[in-house]
């Protein structure tokens, strides 16, 4: 029997950018902090720039996926975001809800990092997936050990030598049992412990250096991940 039920994920946060800058980031700038979304055309059912945006996709049998952003200006060039992700999960409702909720917190944290450190800079986006062996339980910790950040906490500065990639001077801007964020002077590295949600470990690279090469980046990091999960 298909477990088909509606869900709603609500997240409230403050962001280091004006509503206008947040609006730009969540509409046209998603490769800078999440992933490209232009391959999924959505109908904007509400578009009141820069305060209220609702984007919705619909499918057969009543399926839908909807994102709502409500933005309020705050002092100091900041904004308050009220975010609501709603829709229908068709299988493993509890597992999908858990995964989507935790990804939401990490993505919106990354949005804040982008707005604070790289807002408006051109980005080269790269998505890399680890081998299928990374779906096993407890393997995200193996990645942290291979990177050299297993003992590091959020806010720590680290000097890393990544096999096949090179040296990274970074701040650990996010770290928990499922996700890791590293920020260098010109790049955001996002690591996803999706093994906890039944999928391989993955990562994204958001390169603001002006010299990014998605193909070379993908090759280097894929080689590293293959060694970690050999």
At which residue positions do the language-model features occur?
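Acidic, Ser/Thr-rich low-complexity intrinsically disordered segments
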Residues: 123-186
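Hydrophobic ligand-binding cavity/cleft-lining segments
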Residues: 1-39, 96-150
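Beta-strand/loop substructures that line and gate deep hydrophobic ligand-binding cavities in soluble
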Residues: 56-102, 173-230
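Intrinsically disordered, low-complexity segments enriched in polar/charged residues with Gly/Pro
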Residues: 1-3, 57-58, 101, 158-159, ...
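Terminal targeting/leader modules
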Residues: 2-4, 8-16, 20-29, 41-44, ...
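Ordered, small/hydrophobic-rich secondary-structure cores
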Residues: 8-88
């Amino acid at each position: 029997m298909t477990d088909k039920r509606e869900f709603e994920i609500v997240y409230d946060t403050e962001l280091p950018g004006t509503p206008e800058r947040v609006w730009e980031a969540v509409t046209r700038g998603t490769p800078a902090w999440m992933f490209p979304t232009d391959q999924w055309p959505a109908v904007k059912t509400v578009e009141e720039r820069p305060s209220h945006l609702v984007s919705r996709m619909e499918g057969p049998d009543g399926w839908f996926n909807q994102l709502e952003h409500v933005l309020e200006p705050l002092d100091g060039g900041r904004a308050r975001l009220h975010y609501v992700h709603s829709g229908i999960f068709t299988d493993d409702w509890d597992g999908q809800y858990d995964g989507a909720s935790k990804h939401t917190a990490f993505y919106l944290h990354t949005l804040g990092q982008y707005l604070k450190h790289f807002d408006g800079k051109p980005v080269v986006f790269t998505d890399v997936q680890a081998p299928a062996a990374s779906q096993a339980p407890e393997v995200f910790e193996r990645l942290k050990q291979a990177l050299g950040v297993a003992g590091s906490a959020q806010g720590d500065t680290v000097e890393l030598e990544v096999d096949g990639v090179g040296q990274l001077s970074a701040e650990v801007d996010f770290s928990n049992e499922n996700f890791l964020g590293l920020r260098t002077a010109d790049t955001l590295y996002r690591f996803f412990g999706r093994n906890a949600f039944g999928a391989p470990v993955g990562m994204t690279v958001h390169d603001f250096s002006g010299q990014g090469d998605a193909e070379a980046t993908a090759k280097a990091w894929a080689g590293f991940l293959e060694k970690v999960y050999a």
